[in-house]
Amino acid sequence: MIPLLTPFFTARMAQNKTPKYKNVLLIRFSAIGDVAMTVPVIQSLAVSYPDVHFTVLSNVRFAPFFSQMPGNVSFMGVDLKKDYHGFGAMFKLFRQLRKKHFDAVADLHGVLRTTALSVFYRLSFTKVKRINKDRRSRKRITRQKNKDLTPRLTSFDRYRIVLEKLGFRFEVSFRSIFGGGKGNLSSISNIVGAKDCPWIGVAPFAAHKGKIYPLYLMEEVVAQLDSAGVCRQFVFAYGREIAQVQAWADKYRSVEIIDNRLGMGGELILMSHMEVMLAMDSSNMHLASLTGTPVVSIWGATHPAAGFMGWGQNPDDCIQIDLPCRPCSIYGKKECMYGDYRCLTGIDPDTVFTKVKKYL
């Protein structure tokens, strides 16, 4: 390098490592799995930039995700359905946010509500960067002919790219929401008791039918695990789902249904003490991944290539079968074109059992 230019380039390099912004707003309202996927990125960001304060704006019920964050991360919870419904309500929220004097905004959601907030901030001369969901590329995954199953950027990558556009350079290095350890089991021991044998989690439900392994097949897996000597199978079910799996608890000694008794924070603690979680492509897949627990996941209408695998999940633990019609949906909302959901009914319970058993 030319000696006279050395101070110039050295100064520029130092400037690139120094954050331009000191008070940054990060926005992701929903859904639960997508918000969970921000956690590894935000924690890594906060550790890399301890002199910058980050505020996470999200649904109030997702606060437990951020309770173990570094001290330079704050959580601001809102109830959109109750308090901020409609465009006018977004302006009301913006006026409240302005009091916190953010000098940059990262929109990690990219929906109408966050677009409105982004516009308000840009009109007030605040730097805003927004997520690129690359919807056009994802459509090539689900088209009926010549499906392109090249792995897309993960959501973790897309979140990091937004922050890089604001000048934050960092690697996403994350182990668990509880750091290097596990959650405080004594805080929920009055419900789950002490651990004296292998624990596994079973999360048989998802938001859409195209993502749910048929319950009669899942029961075969539960029965095999019970016969194999697993002493505790915690089955995650809520509301109307409970009645659909109550018979399992009555029939198999190892099965215990986990409903809303623990709350999200308690469920994260419980998951951190499990040997493995068996889940669909669902929020529980992501929650368990945040605790560092291995996850065996079942994929039907959706596909890992879309970029929504859990953090640190082993691709070999994604159970799926190859069909010309699969995947047919990015989010699993689409009904089966044949009506039989063969992408799920074709998965052998023995295959699922074998994948889970290797962790016991």
Residue ranges of model-derived segments:
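Catalytic machinery of carbohydrate-active enzymes
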Residues: 1-360
